[in-house]
Amino acid sequence: MGRTKAWQESGGPDTSAVRLKVTRSHMFTRSVASRLCAGNTAALPAEGTQPPVKVASTYNRGLPGEGRRMAGMTEPVTNWAGNITYSAKELHRPHSLDALRALVAQSARVRVLGSGHSFNEIADPGSEGVLVSLTALPPSVEVDTAARTVRVAGGVRYAELARRVHEHGLALHNMASLPHISVAGSVATGTHGSGNGNGSLASAVREVELVTADGSLLTITRGDARFDGAVTSLGALGVVTALTLDLEPDFEVAQQVYGQLPFAGLDFETVSAAAYSVSLFTDWQRSGFVQAWVKRRTDQPLHDFPWAAPATEAMHPVPGMPAENCTQQFGVPGPWHERLPHFRAEFTPSSGAELQSEYLLARPYALDALHALDAIRETIAPVLQICEVRTVAADSQWLSPAYGRDTVAFHFTWVEDTAAVLPVVRRVEEALAPFDPRPHWGKVFTTPPAALRERYPRIDAFTALAGELDPTGTFRNTFVREVLGV
């Protein structure tokens, strides 16, 4: 590539490359006639091939992304769910920032593997590219109590970040349902928790540090004209090595789970505003929610939740699943990071036997969207484990699904059956189409790229920024090129 740096002259970096044996029978081909529009997101396998399979030596049935081993290096690497097998022939785990910079500078295409909790090909660099894991870099977490900020390495998981922040008497504004996901990967895809006044996880970011295509180190801070394109960036601008996040004083949360909540007569705005964070669950086997997870800050006025009865036993979001992996319920106050997620940091939420989709639309459409989905619930229910409805405050990140509008998010946890799920995904997208839904970047969707781009007013600004920071296309894989048109 002709890209060199003085710091590369030490005889070559230790990038801890792992050779991967990738066979065609384990890969999605890109010539499938029924291939989906969005960058081959969870496309059906070509005739004569086998679906991707999980490899025991790659994921050890642990937390998302845990257990990915250096041993068994001839076996394919999959995402957490096992529905995507990465086509890269090498997985690199650099042990230092200099090694990472050297690796990027000498590579034609690079994508970063976070916690593996994406369900499409957003992280796949292609057979000629390299896959990079940040897990061997120092997992630094530096809390500045005076400034109320934390600087965190990109590969650190939210569970560890939250624990360290809490030790200093501070807090993040919100967390996602799972605390086991990486910080950099989460903000890059617009991942969020719930709460009418709570922005996505990316809304807490005040500074991004990334390695660009020529191996340079670049820092972009809030206030820079490029900042709103640099946080939720799909990994298309560089390798994010560190982020600085805003913090606030420590707080406690009390979580109460409630039972049946019918759609009939539902005042969605009032229900979603009843607590700091409200998550509503339905299995679409009936016209209503089966559970409401209500998370109240103890330092804010408490509001009643008169629309449903409190649960009398600990609940799991998926009916019938054991609740021991879930966070404390029954209104017992506890630290923010032990209540805002649905799942405990020390337990495994599931073993990956699922697919996921999510669609985010303007919050005033919440009831109309619920009724549109209710009309096709007999189609949804047979392949659904659970659907979660949450709210997210508007933000200014150019590629955020919550960009410019207070948002309601419909999340679907499907069964592990790609062939059965994809037709239902298309039906869901058709039902929600009148409301201009934006799919979660890291989940299964079939929205045509042209339609998707129309829903992001700053898409042209982002593509210009990608051209500026990555003129060689080092970080633009097939997914990014096709979905964003860059």
Model-based region annotation:
Residues G2-S10, T15-R19, R24-S25, T29-C37, ...:
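Low-acidity, Ser/Thr- and Arg-rich intrinsically disordered low-complexity segments
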Residues G2, G11-G12, G39, G48, ...:
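Residue-identity detector for glycine
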Residues K54, Y59-N60, E66-V486:
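Noncatalytic alpha-helical scaffold of FAD-dependent oxidoreductases
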